[in-house]
Amino acid sequence: MLSSWVRCLGALLFLASVAQAQFQFFEHMFGGGHQEHHQQNTQNSASDSARYQQLWEGTNCNKYLCPGTLACVDFPHHCPCAHPNVEDKVELGEGSAVCISKGGYKPGEAARKIELARKGLL
């Protein structure tokens, strides 16, 4: 008889702990648990262009100021890519250039695909 009470009590404690874990999961998923949330809450940057405009206006350049990187270059097609580790710069031939994702291609493959697309072959 004592053994059945111990089993029953053990099963009840097990079910209670599973239920508690489930409620903590849902509370965390749906915005509860505010104590932890306030510690990790950081201010996101504004979604307007005011910060960019301040940087633009504060940059000294007597040549061409690249809009994507704020680099000062002689000609627009000399602008560097904003993310050179993952982008290739492809000059289009009429004084313009584009930065495209390397996308895991072999070196020069992205430029080749752009050239094929410009010729209507892709």
Curated annotation (Swiss-Prot):
Residues 1-21 form the signal peptide. The keyword Signal applies. Keywords: Signal. GO terms for biological process: ERAD pathway. It comes from the Eukaryota. Probable component of the endoplasmic reticulum-associated degradation (ERAD) pathway. Belongs to the LCL2 family. This is Long chronological lifespan protein 2. It comes from Aspergillus fumigatus (strain CBS 144.89 / FGSC A1163 / CEA10) (Neosartorya fumigata).
